[in-house]
Amino acid sequence: MPLARDLLHPSLDEEKKKHKKKRLVQSPNSYFMDVKCPGCYKITTVFSHAQTVVLCVGCSTVLCQPTGGKARLTEGCSFRRKQH
């Protein structure tokens, strides 16, 4: 680790590792995402830190399950982060 670090222009990797309140510009860790069901290929919008089990609207398959932080996607589900 170098002794001289540029505090005004930190690298993107350093900023991602910091706590959300300690970043140069505060930003949340959570986001919304489009999750595609592996069975019926319908797209459902899911919160990244969902606290309840999310089911598919079409076939009632479990898309994600809550953990302590981020929700765990079911195997076979693909997702895309939504742009704001």
Curated annotation (Swiss-Prot):
Residues 1-16 have a biased composition (Basic and acidic residues). A zinc finger (C4-type) spans 38-60. GO terms for molecular function: RNA binding; structural constituent of ribosome; zinc ion binding. Its cofactor is Zn(2+). Keywords: Metal-binding, Ribonucleoprotein, Ribosomal protein, Zinc, Zinc-finger. InterPro entries: Ribosomal_eS27, Ribosomal_eS27_Zn-bd_dom_sf, Ribosomal_zn-bd. One of its GO terms (cellular component) is cytosolic small ribosomal subunit. It comes from the Eukaryota. The keyword Zinc applies. Binds 1 zinc ion per subunit. GO terms for biological process: ribosomal small subunit assembly; translation. Pfam families: Ribosomal_S27e. Residues 1-23 are annotated as: Disordered. Belongs to the eukaryotic ribosomal protein eS27 family. This is Small ribosomal subunit protein eS27-like. It comes from Bos taurus. The gene is RPS27L.
